[in-house]
């Protein structure tokens, strides 16, 4: 009964990763997250090189598949293509740069911080949006 309550509670949550914030080993923490069955996971590890990201992505995709949690890869279009993964999430500047070429994905997400950005992302082909903070950050 308790687990079904958790599943219900997290069914609309999109978990965005930052392994530096986890006090547990990252894969252990991700297993705990996946067991709660969030709506999706966005693997957002901005400090990794594309090669490092690809290695981590393989592990996280396996874990997400095991728990039937959709996983959106973040930023690295070529990694997603090489892994034949159908979901990508892009910052708006990358969606702008690749608006002609994201068509091979089932879902293209975009992070937006204003209504104007949301409208632009939709015009550029985003199939879903995440709305974040509206103040300046380093991302």
Regions inferred by a protein language model and the residue ranges of each:
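Conserved N-terminal beta1-alpha1 strand-loop-helix module at the mouth
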Residues: 1-89, 93-95, 102-127
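A short acidic, helix-capping loop that chelates divalent metal ions and anchors anionic groups
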Residues: 43, 135-139
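Non-cysteine beta-strand/loop elements that form the S-adenosyl-L-methionine
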Residues: 127-134
């Amino acid at each position: 009964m308790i687990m079904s309550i958790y599943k219900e509670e997290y069914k609309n949550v999109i978990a965005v990763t930052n392994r530096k914030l986890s006090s547990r080993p990252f894969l252990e923490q991700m297993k705990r997250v996946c067991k709660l069955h969030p709506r999706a996971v966005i693997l957002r590890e901005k400090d990794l090189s594309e090669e490092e990201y690809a290695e981590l992505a393989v592990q996280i995709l396996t874990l997400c598949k095991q728990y039937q949690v959709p996983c959106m890869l973040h930023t690295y279009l070529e990694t997603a293509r090489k892994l034949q993964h159908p979901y990508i999430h892009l910052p708006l500047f990358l969606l702008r740069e690749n608006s002609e070429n994201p068509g091979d994905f089932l879902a293209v997400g975009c992070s937006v911080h204003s209504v104007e950005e949301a409208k632009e992302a939709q015009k550029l082909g985003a199939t879903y949006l995440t709305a974040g903070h509206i103040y300046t950050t380093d991302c």
